[in-house]
Amino acid sequence: MSTILVVSGTGTEIGKTVVTAAVAAAARDCRVAVLKPAQTGLAPGEPGDAAEVARLAGSHVTAVELARFPEPLAPATAARRAGLAPVRPFEVAEAAQKLATEHDLVLVEGAGGLLVRFDDEGSTLADAARLLSAPVLVVAPAGLGTLNATALTAEALRSRGLDCRGVVIGSMPAEPDLASRCNIEDLPVAAGAPLLGAVPAGAGALPGADFAAGAARWLAPELGGSWAPGRR
């Protein structure tokens, strides 16, 4: 039976793509698909987040992008300014369900945070997750300020009846400061869900083979890895 997992985060530029790639790489014995509902800020032909996941994770990954908008804005704004049709949650759900018929694991990577709008009616990634009845993995920064943002994201999930599968730190410094070290213990409390990994800062710059080889060390057993809090 296929698994669909939605990957969201507390904001933008926090490591959602590298975390998605790590989860895909850790599932190396599975047929994995990565679905990017809305890619913004790239011109046609430029490699997007889904393609980057496939580059990092390996050849067992199928990369799919539903829509692309040229300006680096929220999907609803980018679609409106480009005069293009926005992405709708039902389209995301249908695409994920179709991929699930041919893959063991489908990862749906959102844009920005959980409640970034897909369209001018206010639809979000959370609506797609609800249509799919899929759990949500939250990617969070390591440092100061992450506890509040993580708690707000988890609260938004709970208020919509969605399952927060856990939290993964998207970019863990090689020499973490005091806040980052303390947050290893405090993030699960803020989220009401387990901390399931910490991807090292700069991992996305690794060659694909090195990234894929290291991914299991960065993720907890629940995500196919061997990571445990306190281990880097």
Describe each PLM feature range.
Residues V92-E121:
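Switch II (G3) loop of P-loop NTPases
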Residues E155-R232:
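C-terminal lobe/tail of nucleotide-utilizing enzymes
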Residues V18-P86, F90, A95-K98:
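N-terminal phosphate/diphosphate-binding loop that engages ATP/GTP or pyrophosphate donors
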